[in-house]
Amino acid sequence: MMRIAVIGAGAIGGFYGARLAASGQDVVFIARGATLSALTTNGLRVTGTEDLTLAVQATDDPTEVGPVDVVLMCTKTFQVADAAASYLPALVGPDTLVVTTQNGLQAPFVLADAIGREHVGPGLCRVWTKIAEPGVIDLMGGPQSLVVGTWDNSITPTLTAFRQALRDAGVDTVDTGDIWTALWTKVIHVVPEGAVGALLDAPLGELLGRHLAIFRRCIQEAVAVGRAHGADFPGDIVDQTLAFLSSQDPASTTSFQRDITAGRPSELEAQMGALPGLGDEVGVDTPVCDVIAETLRVRAERDAAA
């Protein structure tokens, strides 16, 4: 049995934490406010394409928990630094692996600055979930996977045990030997999907239909940036990406898109806002992404000022 702390019991942390707890792992949620109250009073529930309710351990004080084997960092990207400073000193021991679940590439680097690369488990999740209400997670179908590695792609006992824990929990995972290419493989679809969807107020099906030209171009630019940064993509990665997206719910949207549409704080600067800068670092032009990022940035500034 692994001791696992989940920071953030929202759409991502709630789902993976519930699966791991239901499979017999020793899981504790670090939460606060209405979410903490709901977890301690009503437990955690997953609804939608499955129905799971279970009593869970939850606290807002990590010193009550102490060092654990694995920490799942399931906050928004812009919350990672504060969460690391507030919670990780009490949770991280000599062999603790802190797994990122955020979209984009920033979270592992933020954690590395806080706790050292040796404790960072870059991860990528694929699951379509949303918060129905505090303590209730709506599973909308699609893949249910979490791929995890280490900073230098080495295999550690903690990583091996956690991968097995995921399998035991019914979560798909792959023993990747190149976690950074795996992360880029997600970046090239989820970042364009969220950004173009937010720009045009369109679900996935419309991006693959009437808006396919701009959507494809955005993906192509992201692929070029990823390749220049060392991602080992196959030659037909753009077509593979579009084929994967075509197999998903055409009504789906990303959490980033929903945040932008609702005028909430978003991961803009960690996702589409970061791509042009990553391109500049390696001499790759991203004209379509530049315009999309700046348009969304202006919209977010106007919403914040309203």
Predicted regions and their residues:
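Rossmann-like NAD(P)(H) cofactor-binding subdomain of soluble oxidoreductases
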Residues: 51-136
